[in-house]
């Protein structure tokens, strides 16, 4: 059973950009040390992001990376795979929310180096507790194991929010009990962001 922290999924549209041009754009973006996630967090997107992280780490270790996030969230395990790899590399990571960072997307926005969590003015951030997907089946003992694992996952997410915001466990527990939506400014005041920005120059000067 997959553990997820996500908004409802939407259909993916095929890119209208010709493949050769899309490849050139992708290479130019990666060469500028920018990594994007613009869809759900799953095993596919996690694998792609991790490969890019290690490519940048191996080619120029220690040089800053900008991680741009516009995501409705997704699978917890896939999100933590990205989180752990970002913490392992030597390159400092800046996160920039543009559009939406919901659920696991909001967790990923917190993986930045200290003082490097940014968002654009019209971005939104949503936090909540992890969701179960699919039909729950099995023996009573199996369901008990799943429930315990879910609780451990929930507490782990709460601890990340606690460390990121400076709020206590009970305050975060209350905030994620239901979907909590925030504007960029509200997320800044809550402690999920370091700055709301209007230009890339503000990132470079911080």
Swiss-Prot record:
It is found in: Cytoplasm. GO terms for cellular component: cytoplasm; endopeptidase Clp complex. Its main location: cytoplasm. It holds the Pfam family CLP_protease. The active site is at 103 (nucleophile), 128. It is an enzyme of class 3 (hydrolase). GO terms for biological process: protein quality control for misfolded or incompletely synthesized proteins. Belongs to the peptidase S14 family. This is ATP-dependent Clp protease proteolytic subunit 1. It comes from Protochlamydia amoebophila (strain UWE25).
């Amino acid at each position: 059973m997959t553990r997820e922290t996500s908004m409802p999924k939407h259909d993916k549209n095929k890119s209208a950009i010709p493949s050769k041009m899309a490849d050139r754009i992708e290479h130019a973006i990666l060469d500028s040390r920018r990594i994007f996630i613009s869809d759900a967090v799953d095993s596919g997107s996690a694998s792609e992001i991790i490969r890019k992280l290690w490519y940048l780490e191996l080619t120029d270790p220690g040089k800053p990376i900008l991680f741009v996030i516009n995501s409705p969230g997704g699978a917890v395990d896939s999100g933590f795979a990205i989180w752990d790899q970002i913490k392992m590399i030597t390159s400092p990571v800046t996160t920039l929310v543009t559009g939406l960072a919901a659920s696991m997307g909001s967790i990923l926005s917190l993986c930045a180096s200290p003082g490097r969590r940014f968002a654009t003015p019209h971005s939104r951030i949503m936090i909540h507790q992890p969701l179960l997907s699919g039909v729950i089946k099995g023996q009573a003992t199996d369901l008990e194991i799943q429930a315990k694992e879910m609780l451990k996952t929930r507490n782990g997410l709460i601890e990340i929010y606690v460390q990121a915001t400076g709020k206590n466990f009970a305050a975060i527990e209350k905030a994620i009990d239901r979907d909590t939506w925030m504007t960029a400014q509200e997320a800044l005041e809550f402690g999920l962001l370091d700055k709301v920005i209007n230009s890339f120059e503000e990132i470079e000067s911080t």
